[in-house]
Amino acid sequence: MTIRSVVLGCGSYLPQRVVTNAELASRIETSDEWIVQRTGIRERHVAADGEFTSHLAINAARAALANADVDPQSIDLIVLGTSTPDNTFPATAVAVQNGLGIHHGAAFDLQAVCSGFVYALATADNFLRSGSFKRALVIGAETFSRILDWNDRTTCVLFGDGAGALVLDAQQQGGTAADRGVLSTHLRSDGRHKAKLYVDGGPSSTQTVGHLRMEGREVFKHAVGMITDVIVDAFEATGLSAETIDWFVPHQANKRIIDASAHKLHIAPEKVVLTVDRHGNTSAASIPLALDVAVKDGRIKKGDVVLLEAMGGGFTWGSALVRW
Protein backbone atom coordinates (compact mmCIF):
# COMPACT_ATOMS: atom_id res chain seq x y z
CA MET A 1 0.00 0.00 0.00
CA THR A 2 1.09 3.57 -0.74
CA ILE A 3 -0.06 6.91 0.64
CA ARG A 4 -1.36 9.17 -2.12
CA SER A 5 -2.47 12.80 -1.94
CA VAL A 6 -6.04 12.54 -3.22
CA VAL A 7 -7.90 15.61 -4.48
CA LEU A 8 -11.10 16.06 -2.47
CA GLY A 9 -12.18 19.35 -4.01
CA CYS A 10 -11.20 22.53 -5.80
CA GLY A 11 -12.23 26.16 -5.79
CA SER A 12 -11.30 29.54 -7.23
CA TYR A 13 -11.87 33.24 -6.92
CA LEU A 14 -11.56 36.10 -9.41
CA PRO A 15 -11.77 39.81 -8.59
CA GLN A 16 -14.93 41.48 -9.84
CA ARG A 17 -13.28 44.01 -12.13
CA VAL A 18 -12.61 42.82 -15.70
CA VAL A 19 -10.14 44.72 -17.90
CA THR A 20 -10.62 44.07 -21.61
CA ASN A 21 -8.09 44.51 -24.37
CA ALA A 22 -10.19 47.42 -25.62
CA GLU A 23 -9.76 49.21 -22.29
CA LEU A 24 -6.00 48.71 -22.42
CA ALA A 25 -5.92 49.94 -26.01
CA SER A 26 -7.54 53.18 -24.86
CA ARG A 27 -4.66 53.78 -22.44
CA ILE A 28 -1.53 52.48 -24.17
CA GLU A 29 -0.35 51.88 -27.72
CA THR A 30 -1.82 48.45 -28.41
CA SER A 31 -4.92 46.82 -29.87
CA ASP A 32 -7.19 43.87 -29.24
CA GLU A 33 -5.93 42.27 -32.45
CA TRP A 34 -2.27 42.70 -31.46
CA ILE A 35 -2.81 41.14 -28.01
CA VAL A 36 -5.00 38.24 -29.17
CA GLN A 37 -2.72 37.36 -32.08
CA ARG A 38 0.38 37.16 -29.88
CA THR A 39 -1.07 35.77 -26.65
CA GLY A 40 -4.66 34.57 -27.03
CA ILE A 41 -5.69 36.88 -24.16
CA ARG A 42 -8.94 38.87 -24.47
CA GLU A 43 -9.51 40.01 -20.88
CA ARG A 44 -8.20 39.67 -17.36
CA HIS A 45 -9.39 40.35 -13.80
CA VAL A 46 -7.81 43.02 -11.60
CA ALA A 47 -8.06 43.24 -7.82
CA ALA A 48 -9.84 46.24 -6.32
CA ASP A 49 -8.11 48.80 -4.13
CA GLY A 50 -7.77 47.23 -0.70
CA GLU A 51 -8.21 43.70 -2.08
CA PHE A 52 -5.06 41.74 -1.23
CA THR A 53 -3.59 38.40 -2.26
CA SER A 54 -4.75 36.94 1.06
CA HIS A 55 -8.35 37.97 0.34
CA LEU A 56 -8.27 36.20 -3.02
CA ALA A 57 -6.66 33.12 -1.46
CA ILE A 58 -9.17 32.95 1.41
CA ASN A 59 -12.10 33.09 -1.01
CA ALA A 60 -10.60 30.37 -3.22
CA ALA A 61 -9.85 28.21 -0.17
CA ARG A 62 -13.40 28.56 1.13
CA ALA A 63 -14.74 27.51 -2.26
CA ALA A 64 -12.44 24.48 -2.33
CA LEU A 65 -13.41 23.44 1.20
CA ALA A 66 -17.09 23.72 0.29
CA ASN A 67 -16.55 21.72 -2.89
CA ALA A 68 -14.71 19.04 -0.89
CA ASP A 69 -17.38 19.14 1.84
CA VAL A 70 -14.77 19.12 4.60
CA ASP A 71 -14.45 21.05 7.85
CA PRO A 72 -11.72 23.72 7.74
CA GLN A 73 -10.54 22.40 11.11
CA SER A 74 -9.49 19.16 9.40
CA ILE A 75 -6.79 21.07 7.48
CA ASP A 76 -3.38 20.78 9.10
CA LEU A 77 -1.21 22.14 6.26
CA ILE A 78 -1.54 25.20 4.01
CA VAL A 79 0.97 25.79 1.22
CA LEU A 80 0.47 29.01 -0.72
CA GLY A 81 2.26 29.65 -4.00
CA THR A 82 2.58 33.39 -4.59
CA SER A 83 5.03 36.02 -5.82
CA THR A 84 2.83 38.88 -4.62
CA PRO A 85 2.46 38.43 -0.85
CA ASP A 86 0.55 40.93 1.26
CA ASN A 87 3.72 41.77 3.19
CA THR A 88 7.40 40.88 3.15
CA PHE A 89 6.54 38.94 6.30
CA PRO A 90 4.69 37.22 7.86
CA ALA A 91 3.71 34.71 5.21
CA THR A 92 0.43 35.38 3.44
CA ALA A 93 -0.45 31.74 4.15
CA VAL A 94 -0.66 32.62 7.85
CA ALA A 95 -3.21 35.34 7.05
CA VAL A 96 -5.16 32.77 5.03
CA GLN A 97 -4.99 30.26 7.88
CA ASN A 98 -6.31 32.87 10.30
CA GLY A 99 -8.99 34.00 7.87
CA LEU A 100 -10.27 30.43 7.71
CA GLY A 101 -10.35 30.19 11.51
CA ILE A 102 -7.62 27.53 11.60
CA HIS A 103 -5.19 27.86 14.51
CA HIS A 104 -3.23 24.63 14.34
CA GLY A 105 -0.92 22.87 11.92
CA ALA A 106 1.47 24.67 9.56
CA ALA A 107 1.10 27.38 6.93
CA PHE A 108 3.76 28.90 4.71
CA ASP A 109 4.34 30.63 1.38
CA LEU A 110 6.33 29.20 -1.50
CA GLN A 111 7.75 31.41 -4.26
CA ALA A 112 8.48 29.95 -7.68
CA VAL A 113 6.66 32.61 -9.74
CA CYS A 114 4.44 31.01 -12.42
CA SER A 115 5.59 27.53 -11.35
CA GLY A 116 4.43 28.28 -7.82
CA PHE A 117 1.35 26.07 -7.82
CA VAL A 118 3.19 23.01 -9.17
CA TYR A 119 5.95 23.59 -6.59
CA ALA A 120 3.34 23.99 -3.83
CA LEU A 121 1.51 20.85 -4.95
CA ALA A 122 4.75 18.85 -4.95
CA THR A 123 5.68 20.16 -1.50
CA ALA A 124 2.30 19.36 0.03
CA ASP A 125 2.28 15.95 -1.64
CA ASN A 126 5.63 15.04 -0.12
CA PHE A 127 4.53 16.19 3.34
CA LEU A 128 1.34 14.12 3.12
CA ARG A 129 3.11 11.02 1.80
CA SER A 130 5.68 11.27 4.60
CA GLY A 131 2.91 11.13 7.20
CA SER A 132 3.78 14.57 8.61
CA PHE A 133 0.32 15.95 7.79
CA LYS A 134 -3.05 14.46 6.89
CA ARG A 135 -4.99 17.05 4.91
CA ALA A 136 -3.70 20.07 3.00
CA LEU A 137 -4.87 23.19 1.24
CA VAL A 138 -2.71 23.96 -1.78
CA ILE A 139 -3.31 27.46 -3.07
CA GLY A 140 -2.04 29.63 -5.90
CA ALA A 141 -2.92 33.31 -5.50
CA GLU A 142 -1.58 36.46 -7.15
CA THR A 143 -2.16 40.19 -7.51
CA PHE A 144 0.27 40.75 -10.37
CA SER A 145 -1.51 43.99 -11.26
CA ARG A 146 0.42 45.53 -8.33
CA ILE A 147 3.85 44.83 -9.86
CA LEU A 148 3.15 45.76 -13.49
CA ASP A 149 4.47 48.79 -15.33
CA TRP A 150 1.21 49.90 -16.91
CA ASN A 151 3.12 51.90 -19.52
CA ASP A 152 4.95 48.80 -20.81
CA ARG A 153 2.67 47.29 -23.42
CA THR A 154 4.84 44.16 -23.73
CA THR A 155 4.05 43.07 -20.15
CA CYS A 156 0.99 44.88 -18.76
CA VAL A 157 -1.34 43.24 -21.29
CA LEU A 158 -0.32 39.74 -20.22
CA PHE A 159 -1.18 39.41 -16.55
CA GLY A 160 -4.23 39.22 -14.32
CA ASP A 161 -5.18 38.59 -10.70
CA GLY A 162 -6.90 35.57 -9.17
CA ALA A 163 -6.63 32.54 -6.91
CA GLY A 164 -7.33 28.82 -7.00
CA ALA A 165 -7.08 26.03 -4.44
CA LEU A 166 -7.15 22.26 -4.01
CA VAL A 167 -7.89 20.18 -0.92
CA LEU A 168 -5.59 17.16 -0.69
CA ASP A 169 -6.18 14.19 1.62
CA ALA A 170 -3.62 11.50 2.54
CA GLN A 171 -5.17 8.14 1.64
CA GLN A 172 -3.90 4.58 1.33
CA GLN A 173 -3.80 3.47 -2.31
CA GLY A 174 -2.45 0.49 -4.21
CA GLY A 175 0.81 2.03 -5.37
CA THR A 176 0.15 1.94 -9.13
CA ALA A 177 -0.76 4.46 -11.82
CA ALA A 178 -4.37 3.33 -11.34
CA ASP A 179 -4.40 5.06 -7.92
CA ARG A 180 -6.33 8.24 -7.34
CA GLY A 181 -4.24 11.20 -6.27
CA VAL A 182 -0.91 12.76 -7.17
CA LEU A 183 1.00 10.17 -9.21
CA SER A 184 4.19 12.13 -9.84
CA THR A 185 5.78 15.56 -9.53
CA HIS A 186 8.95 16.79 -11.20
CA LEU A 187 10.54 20.16 -10.41
CA ARG A 188 13.40 21.99 -12.13
CA SER A 189 15.19 25.35 -11.99
CA ASP A 190 18.12 27.08 -13.69
CA GLY A 191 19.24 30.41 -12.25
CA ARG A 192 21.34 31.28 -15.29
CA HIS A 193 18.13 32.66 -16.79
CA LYS A 194 17.03 34.82 -13.84
CA ALA A 195 17.52 38.12 -15.72
CA LYS A 196 15.11 37.09 -18.48
CA LEU A 197 12.03 37.38 -16.24
CA TYR A 198 12.24 39.24 -12.95
CA VAL A 199 10.98 42.12 -10.80
CA ASP A 200 13.39 45.05 -10.52
CA GLY A 201 12.90 45.59 -6.80
CA GLY A 202 13.01 43.91 -3.42
CA PRO A 203 13.53 44.59 0.28
CA SER A 204 17.23 43.67 0.23
CA SER A 205 18.24 45.22 -3.09
CA THR A 206 16.19 48.39 -3.60
CA GLN A 207 13.80 48.62 -0.65
CA THR A 208 11.00 49.07 -3.20
CA VAL A 209 8.45 46.68 -4.70
CA GLY A 210 9.62 47.18 -8.29
CA HIS A 211 8.02 46.19 -11.59
CA LEU A 212 7.99 43.05 -13.69
CA ARG A 213 10.54 42.97 -16.52
CA MET A 214 10.65 40.29 -19.20
CA GLU A 215 12.57 39.36 -22.32
CA GLY A 216 9.55 37.83 -24.02
CA ARG A 217 11.32 36.26 -26.97
CA GLU A 218 13.90 34.61 -24.70
CA VAL A 219 11.19 33.21 -22.44
CA PHE A 220 9.29 31.82 -25.42
CA LYS A 221 12.47 30.31 -26.87
CA HIS A 222 13.17 28.29 -23.72
CA ALA A 223 9.62 27.55 -22.61
CA VAL A 224 8.53 24.81 -24.99
CA GLY A 225 11.69 22.73 -24.60
CA MET A 226 11.76 22.96 -20.82
CA ILE A 227 8.07 22.19 -20.48
CA THR A 228 8.12 19.18 -22.77
CA ASP A 229 11.27 17.72 -21.17
CA VAL A 230 9.78 17.72 -17.67
CA ILE A 231 6.54 16.22 -18.98
CA VAL A 232 8.48 13.41 -20.64
CA ASP A 233 10.03 12.77 -17.20
CA ALA A 234 6.52 12.44 -15.75
CA PHE A 235 5.42 10.03 -18.46
CA GLU A 236 8.52 7.87 -17.98
CA ALA A 237 8.05 7.78 -14.19
CA THR A 238 4.42 6.66 -14.37
CA GLY A 239 4.19 4.68 -17.60
CA LEU A 240 1.51 7.08 -18.83
CA SER A 241 1.58 8.91 -22.16
CA ALA A 242 -0.04 11.64 -24.23
CA GLU A 243 -2.53 9.03 -25.41
CA THR A 244 -3.50 7.80 -21.93
CA ILE A 245 -3.97 11.14 -20.16
CA ASP A 246 -7.45 12.64 -20.21
CA TRP A 247 -6.65 16.32 -19.77
CA PHE A 248 -3.70 18.68 -20.15
CA VAL A 249 -3.95 21.72 -17.86
CA PRO A 250 -0.93 23.91 -18.55
CA HIS A 251 0.11 27.18 -16.99
CA GLN A 252 -1.98 29.76 -18.82
CA ALA A 253 0.76 32.13 -19.97
CA ASN A 254 0.41 32.36 -23.71
CA LYS A 255 -1.70 30.39 -26.17
CA ARG A 256 1.19 30.03 -28.61
CA ILE A 257 3.37 28.38 -25.95
CA ILE A 258 0.51 26.08 -24.92
CA ASP A 259 -0.25 25.09 -28.51
CA ALA A 260 3.41 24.48 -29.33
CA SER A 261 3.94 22.35 -26.21
CA ALA A 262 0.85 20.23 -26.87
CA HIS A 263 1.88 19.76 -30.50
CA LYS A 264 5.42 18.69 -29.57
CA LEU A 265 4.06 16.18 -27.04
CA HIS A 266 1.39 14.88 -29.48
CA ILE A 267 -1.39 15.84 -27.07
CA ALA A 268 -4.70 16.15 -28.92
CA PRO A 269 -6.03 19.74 -28.94
CA GLU A 270 -9.36 18.61 -27.49
CA LYS A 271 -7.55 17.47 -24.32
CA VAL A 272 -6.09 20.93 -23.62
CA VAL A 273 -7.84 23.13 -21.05
CA LEU A 274 -7.51 26.79 -22.05
CA THR A 275 -8.54 29.74 -19.89
CA VAL A 276 -5.83 32.25 -20.86
CA ASP A 277 -8.35 34.09 -23.04
CA ARG A 278 -10.48 35.10 -20.03
CA HIS A 279 -7.95 35.10 -17.18
CA GLY A 280 -4.68 36.22 -18.75
CA ASN A 281 -1.52 35.01 -17.04
CA THR A 282 -2.32 34.77 -13.33
CA SER A 283 1.07 33.25 -12.48
CA ALA A 284 0.78 30.69 -9.65
CA ALA A 285 -3.02 30.96 -9.74
CA SER A 286 -3.44 29.96 -13.38
CA ILE A 287 -3.42 26.17 -13.06
CA PRO A 288 -5.88 25.88 -10.14
CA LEU A 289 -8.13 28.47 -11.82
CA ALA A 290 -8.15 26.38 -15.01
CA LEU A 291 -8.71 23.17 -13.04
CA ASP A 292 -11.73 24.67 -11.31
CA VAL A 293 -13.21 25.80 -14.63
CA ALA A 294 -12.83 22.31 -16.13
CA VAL A 295 -14.23 20.58 -13.05
CA LYS A 296 -17.20 22.93 -12.81
CA ASP A 297 -18.11 22.57 -16.50
CA GLY A 298 -17.97 18.78 -16.24
CA ARG A 299 -14.90 18.04 -18.31
CA ILE A 300 -12.67 16.76 -15.50
CA LYS A 301 -14.34 13.84 -13.71
CA LYS A 302 -13.37 11.44 -10.95
CA GLY A 303 -10.81 8.95 -12.26
CA ASP A 304 -9.51 11.19 -15.05
CA VAL A 305 -5.75 11.56 -15.45
CA VAL A 306 -4.77 15.22 -15.49
CA LEU A 307 -1.37 16.50 -16.60
CA LEU A 308 -0.19 19.81 -15.12
CA GLU A 309 2.83 21.87 -16.14
CA ALA A 310 4.23 25.33 -15.52
CA MET A 311 7.26 27.49 -16.17
CA GLY A 312 8.17 30.74 -14.46
CA GLY A 313 10.88 33.23 -13.64
CA GLY A 314 14.20 31.87 -12.50
CA PHE A 315 13.73 29.91 -14.63
CA THR A 316 11.64 27.43 -12.66
CA TRP A 317 9.49 24.76 -14.22
CA GLY A 318 7.72 21.56 -13.29
CA SER A 319 5.06 18.97 -14.02
CA ALA A 320 2.58 16.86 -12.10
CA LEU A 321 0.33 13.94 -12.98
CA VAL A 322 -2.85 13.58 -10.95
CA ARG A 323 -5.64 11.03 -11.15
CA TRP A 324 -8.73 12.99 -10.12
UniProtKB/Swiss-Prot annotation:
Localization in the cell: Cytoplasm
Does Coiled coil count among this protein's keywords?
no
Q: Where is the signal peptide?
A: none
Instruction: Name the enzyme's class.
Output: transferase
**Principal location listed in the UniProt entry:** cytoplasm
- The EC number(s) attached to this protein equal 2.3.1.180
Q: Where is this region: ACP-binding?
A: 252-256
- Record's superkingdom? Bacteria
Catalytic machinery residues = C114, H251, N281
Q: In which pathway does it act?
A: Lipid metabolism; fatty acid biosynthesis
Keyword set for this entry? Acyltransferase, Cytoplasm, Fatty acid biosynthesis, Fatty acid metabolism, Lipid biosynthesis, Lipid metabolism, Multifunctional enzyme, Transferase
InterPro entries, per database record: ACP_syn_III_C, ACP_syn_III_N, FabH, Thiolase-like
Q: Per its UniProt record, what Pfam families does this chain match? A: ACP_syn_III, ACP_syn_III_C
User: GO cellular component annotations, sorted alphabetically?
Assistant: cytoplasm
Q: Which reaction does it catalyse?
A: malonyl-[ACP] + acetyl-CoA + H(+) = 3-oxobutanoyl-[ACP] + CO2 + CoA
Q: Name one GO biological process term.
A: fatty acid biosynthetic process
Q: Answer yes or no on keyword Lipid metabolism.
A: yes
Q: Which SUPFAM superfamilies match?
A: Thiolase-like (SSF53901)
Molecular function in Gene Ontology: 3-oxoacyl-[acyl-carrier-protein] synthase activity; beta-ketoacyl-acyl-carrier-protein synthase III activity
| Record note on quaternary structure | Homodimer.
Q: What does this protein do?
A: Catalyzes the condensation reaction of fatty acid synthesis by the addition to an acyl acceptor of two carbons from malonyl-ACP. Catalyzes the first condensation reaction which initiates fatty acid synthesis and may therefore play a role in governing the total rate of fatty acid production. Possesses both acetoacetyl-ACP synthase and acetyl transacylase activities. Its substrate specificity determines the biosynthesis of branched-chain and/or straight-chain of fatty acids.
**According to its record, what is known about the domains?**
The last Arg residue of the ACP-binding site is essential for the weak association between ACP/AcpP and FabH.
PANTHER family in the cross-refs:
3-OXOACYL-[ACYL-CARRIER-PROTEIN] SYNTHASE, BETA-KETOACYL-[ACYL-CARRIER-PROTEIN] SYNTHASE III, CHLOROPLASTIC
The family assignment reads: Belongs to the thiolase-like superfamily. FabH family.
Q: What is this protein called?
A: Beta-ketoacyl-[acyl-carrier-protein] synthase III
Classification of source organism: Bacteria, Pseudomonadati, Pseudomonadota, Alphaproteobacteria, Hyphomicrobiales
Gene coding for it: fabH
